[in-house]
Every structure is written in structure tokens, then in C-alpha cells.
Amino acid sequence: MAHHEEHKKVELTKKKLVDVMKHVDICMMTTVAATGRLHSRPMSNNKDVEWDGDTWFFAYADSSQVQEIAANSNVNLGYSRPDKIIFVSLTGSGVIVHDLAKKKELWYKALDFWFPNGPEDPAVVLIRVAGQYAYYWSKEGEGDLDL
């Protein structure tokens, strides 16, 4: 029988959560499909280091994630830094945002690859995930935080 050590509890703070998220550009966004199955895909969180509880993503209005969030707002974001043995699961509520000023504010040059018509393209929308709960694992231990 394998020996199992209980992970020690660590205090997860918003500052620690921001520090992990700002070093991980790509997270796995999980939404609920019409079939009820969980549907995950990689998404860039734009390294939003001034995190206030909301995480922003760009997507096309006709994409699966936008359609799924419109039908069921439950979203999970999975962040991973295996090199540092740090993992975060962030649960929240997603909403689709059609705000040109916000798109321009969050836009950065690398997005031109995915969205060649720029932030003015009406087919490009924002997904805002309002964080509600986070769980953190690291080599020091694990902890959670209600947001």
C-alpha cells in the first residue's frame, strides 16, 4: 500500500493568486456544453496582472465557448506552472461583453494573429469570468479562497 502524506494547508491570498496567474499566459477554460459534458480549451488570459477578480478573454462571437457561456455561465479556469509545481483552479461565472472601449483597452499586438481585423471587428467579443472560488496546490501545500 502506498504511503499518503496529507498536504499541509497554506493560506491562499489574492496576492498569491495574482502572482501565479501573471506568470501563466495560457489557461484551460472549461465550460458546460449543451450535452452537459465539460468542454475545455486553451485560452490566453492576457497576463492580466492587475487582477480584480475578473479575468478577460477575447473570442469570436460564434465560438463554442461563447455559445456555451451564453447558455450556462459556469466556468472553470485551470492554471499550471509545472516547472514551479504550482496549480490553480479558479471557478467563476462567465458573461459575454460587447464593449469596443474595453476591447481596445485590453488589446495587444499578439492578438492580431488570432483576430486579424482587430478589436473593432464586431465578430470579436470579450468573455469576462468573475472569479468566485480558487483552489491552489504547490509543493508547500494547498489552500483555497472564496473571492
Please identify what each model-predicted range represents:
Residues 46-84:
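A short mixed-secondary-structure module that forms the rim of ligand-binding clefts
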Residues 28, 54-56, 135:
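General beta-strand recognition
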Residues 7-24:
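Short, basic/aromatic recognition patches
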Residues 33-37, 44-47:
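A glycine-rich, hydrophobic loop/mini-helix early in the fold
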Residues 25, 41, 51-53, 71-75, ...:
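A generic structural signal for short beta-strands and their flanking turns/coil linkers
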Residues 2-12, 90-147:
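Charged, gly/pro-rich active-site loop segments
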Residues 19-35, 75-79:
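A short, Trp-centered hydrophobic/proline-enriched beta-strand micro-motif
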Residues 5-8, 34-35, 54-56:
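Short, flexible loop segments at the rims of nucleotide/cofactor-binding pockets, characterized by
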